[in-house]
Every structure is written in C-alpha cells, then in structure tokens.
Amino acid sequence: MKLSEFKFALPAELVAQHPAANRDEAKMMVINRATGTIEHKIFKDIINYFDEGDIMVMNNTKVFPARLYGNKEKTGAKIEVFLLRELNAELHLWDVLVDPARKIRVGNKLYFGESDLVAEVVDNTTSRGRTIRFLFDGNSEDFSKIIETIGETPLPRYIKRPIEEADKDRYQTIFAENKGAVAAPTAGLHFTKQVMKRMEIKGVNFAPLTLHVGLGSFRTVDVEDLTKHKMDSENFIIESTTADVVNKALDNKKRVCAIGTTSMRALESSVSANNRLKQNAGWTDRFIFPPYDFKIANCMLTNFHMPESTLYMMACAFGGYELMTKAYKTAIKEKYNFLSYGDVMLII
C-alpha cells in the first residue's frame, strides 16, 4: 500500500489537550472484525468483552522526564535538550535532540539551571541529533534523581499547552515499572486499579512485557512506497513467564489482547518457528502495515492516531483497511478525541 492511502483530515479540535477526567471513562469504540459492526462504549465496559483465561498483554515501560532546558555557555541562549537514550551509564553519555540545533556544535557546553549539571557536546548524529556527555561524578542512581528534578514530562508537541503537575501522573500507566520510555504507551493510560481488579476477578490475566517507547512513533513517513520507510529501533524484553501464559491462551483458543501498538510490535518481533511467543530481548524496528499476518494477538486496544502515521497503519493492518477507514470516519463524525490523551478503540 501507499502512504497517500492513509490520508484523512483530522480536525484540530479533536486532538485531545487533556485526558478524560477519569482514566476509565474515555470513550471506547468497539470494532468487531468478523461482523464489521461498530459499537460506542466507555472504557470501563471493556470487562464485558473478555472471559476467564483471556490475556491482556501490557507494556510496563515507564516514562522519564526526558525534556530538559539548558543554557549555552557564553551566550546563555536557551536550548531544549530531549534525552532519547542512554549510551553509557558510567560516562553519562546520551543520544539527544537539541533545539535550536544550529546553535549547538561539538565542544559546546550546556548548563542546566540551578542544578550545577553541565553537559558537553561530543558528536553530531543527525541535523538535530547530538551525543552529549554529562559532566557528573555521581552514580547512575544519583544522576537519575537529578533528571527527575530538572526534567519535564515529555508531552508530545501536539499538546499545545503548558505542562501541568497532573501530567506527571496522567502521562504514565498505572502499571509502569521499568524506566526508559520518552513517550507513554497510550492505550494503557485508560486502565485503573478498579478495572484491572474486576478483570482479574473474572479470570482475565495480565501479562507484562517491556518496550521502551522512543520518538519514532511521532516521526513522519516521507516516502510514498511504504517498503522504503525505516522505523527507529526500540529496546524490548519479553520474559518466559509472559511467553508461557500467552502460549497457553493461544492453545486454549482464548483472546490475547495487545494493549497498544508498542505491545503489538514487541509480540510480533518475538514469534517462534511454530507461531508461538518466545522469550526475547533486544531491539526491534518492525514496521507493520497492510497487508500483514499477525501471529500472536487476536485482539488489540489502541488510541486514535494521526493520519499517515505508522500507528494508524498498524491499526489498519490489524482491523482491516476498509473497516478502519469507516471507523475513523465515524470517530470524527462522533467527535472522538484523538492521540495520546484521547479516546480508545478495541478491535476484536
């Protein structure tokens, strides 16, 4: 398929600037692939679509405050430094994006507020990308504490309002455990302890994996021929305990629901020769677009995505292109909220 086939007009007012007042009360569109029907529910109704022995696969990555603001030495110019990934914990070496990039060259030093933290630019990686070394004597734990203090919740740019204290909590799933994401796995944001408890009482199991979400999901696709698009790599881990419960559910013909595109990408990057989930750890740059034969999950929970985004393409691959086109037209007509803080879709 071609990039232009994933184009649609998204009204600006449907891009959610705040989350729903209560996590589990966002609107939920339920799409049945077998019947082609579309239902309108709220998220807490999700319990009605799952039974004993079904599995929800959740991404337990934890967002860290990746957006820093520093000042360039001598000029004092304000520079945004967005932490992408740690390259060397001992040396405090990081891959970052800087803005404005034209002002930042190798050898420049950046000073971060009253924290006494200083960083030196050691390499150019892309037009906005730099490798920087934080000149810090302490260990990783101490360094993390400083970043937690001076960093800002990395809300996506399409949320055009100042960061609020509530974002620290709301831009994080309640099951976040393993720090390393610079964007939230947003389908998971709708879960509350109450919803999870009710599902567990019903016999639904939650199986964790970790995929540290990078900025790749926000990167625009700029080639019409999708086979030429290259995804950014993201680090993931699937433990044997998760593989075992997922495979048992598959053997018993139960529902295996990927909570979000990140969980789905990790699952599809860990398929054994006999189409079962295997324990795995590493990096994945898997790009899923139609047509695609999904091997593990037979159900998917995902927010409403940007036109021409790799996330929308994955939803189309899973739900079927025609049905998803219809669903998105319906979502716009019914004024569903889109993107990270928006409403959610359950594809069964």
Curated annotation (Swiss-Prot):
EC numbers for this chain: 2.4.99.17
Any one GO cellular component localisation term in the record: cytoplasm
One Gene Ontology MF term: S-adenosylmethionine:tRNA ribosyltransferase-isomerase activity
Domain of life of the source: Bacteria
Record carries keyword Transferase: yes
Pathway where it operates: tRNA modification; tRNA-queuosine biosynthesis
Keyword set, alphabetical order: Cytoplasm, Queuosine biosynthesis, S-adenosyl-L-methionine, Transferase
InterPro entries: QueA (IPR003699), QueA_dom1 (IPR042118), QueA_dom2 (IPR042119), QueA_sf (IPR036100)
Catalytic activity: 7-aminomethyl-7-carbaguanosine(34) in tRNA + S-adenosyl-L-methionine = epoxyqueuosine(34) in tRNA + adenine + L-methionine + 2 H(+)
Subcellular location: Cytoplasm
GO biological process, one term: queuosine biosynthetic process
Assembly description: Monomer.
Known role: Transfers and isomerizes the ribose moiety from AdoMet to the 7-aminomethyl group of 7-deazaguanine (preQ1-tRNA) to give epoxyqueuosine (oQ-tRNA).
Family statement drawn from the similarity comment of this UniProt entry: Belongs to the QueA family.
Protein name: S-adenosylmethionine:tRNA ribosyltransferase-isomerase
Lineage of the organism: Bacteria, Pseudomonadati, Bacteroidota, Cytophagia, Cytophagales
